[in-house]
Amino acid sequence: MKLHFTKMHGAGNDFVVLDGIATPIDFTPEQWRAIADRHFGVGADQLLLVERSTRPDVDFRYRIFNHDGGEVEQCGNGARCFVKFVTDRGLTDKRTIRVEVMNGISTLTMQPDGQVTVDMGAPVFEAARLPFVPDALPTRVEGRDTQHALQINGRTAWLSTVSMGNPHAVQVVDDAEAFPVREDGPLIESHAVFPRRVNAGFMEIADRHAIRLRVYERGAGETLACGTGACAAAVAGIRRGLLDSPVKVTTHGGDLTIAWAGEGEPVMMTGPATTVFEGTLDLDALKQTAAH
């Protein structure tokens, strides 16, 4: 059996997108991993499954699977690719759509210039909702933000914790490019204080409206861009009094613009979405790959 797929990226964060409306799909984690494998599959940071929603107040549902096969709550770059996918395939003619994801409802708008704006919802800071178990960790307050300290590779990492539908721990570094993200990232990601693991962000402040960011994503490793990570970093910087909205976030994959009006307000993310190529998966071969 053959299954059509579309390869896309949002600022270098790449996805395999599957139309679960045309063909119902129920893959195992092993099969998702096989598709995401860059040697034996198509290759992707994450995979997006487009489905119809059973809710009358939304247009679509989509599910997000990490490179390791695990399903996750939200993905900002994936949301932008999702909008382009359903628009290009003629599944909707709306400029603004409402979609259901694991953690709630998102509103997505295709701009006239092809950029996509995503209403990412209001950030959450309560530790229990990330979840985050700080116990007796050292703390400090900067502006409206409370940070907690972890000892990572002999360095003190002061972390701002925020959920953008998925958990993030953000620290400010002097030089994002030189920082050992691939060494410290996995230690933060899997630290015991984060029971469901965490996305680790490393933010360099350029000026009050611009940062450089690298993110070690939960279940995916370092990626070229992370939309929810960009939102979390901008929010953390604004709460700490280091940044003002809007914030230009420069990643290895490109730039995103993040706007946030403050406590209780939604975070608005604007950025590109690009189709790279289309193809077909051989499901029989995929099952064999997944079995090994």
Curated annotation (Swiss-Prot):
Pathway: Amino-acid biosynthesis; L-lysine biosynthesis via DAP pathway; DL-2,6-diaminopimelate from LL-2,6-diaminopimelate: step 1/1. Substrate binds at residues 13, 46, 66, 76-77, 166, 199, 217-218, 227-228. Gene3D superfamilies: Diaminopimelate Epimerase, Chain A, domain 1 (3.10.310.10). The record marks 168, 217 as: Could be important to modulate the pK values of the two catalytic cysteine residues. The keyword Amino-acid biosynthesis applies. Its EC number is 5.1.1.7. The active site is at residues 75, 226. GO terms for cellular component: cytosol. Its main location: cytoplasm. One of its GO terms (biological process) is lysine biosynthetic process via diaminopimelate. It is found in: Cytoplasm. It comes from the Bacteria. Pfam families: DAP_epimerase (PF01678). It catalyses: (2S,6S)-2,6-diaminopimelate = meso-2,6-diaminopimelate. Keywords: Amino-acid biosynthesis, Cytoplasm, Isomerase, Lysine biosynthesis. Coiled coil: none annotated. GO terms for molecular function: diaminopimelate epimerase activity. Catalyzes the stereoinversion of LL-2,6-diaminopimelate (L,L-DAP) to meso-diaminopimelate (meso-DAP), a precursor of L-lysine and an essential component of the bacterial peptidoglycan. Belongs to the diaminopimelate epimerase family. Homodimer. This is Diaminopimelate epimerase. It comes from Ralstonia nicotianae (strain ATCC BAA-1114 / GMI1000).
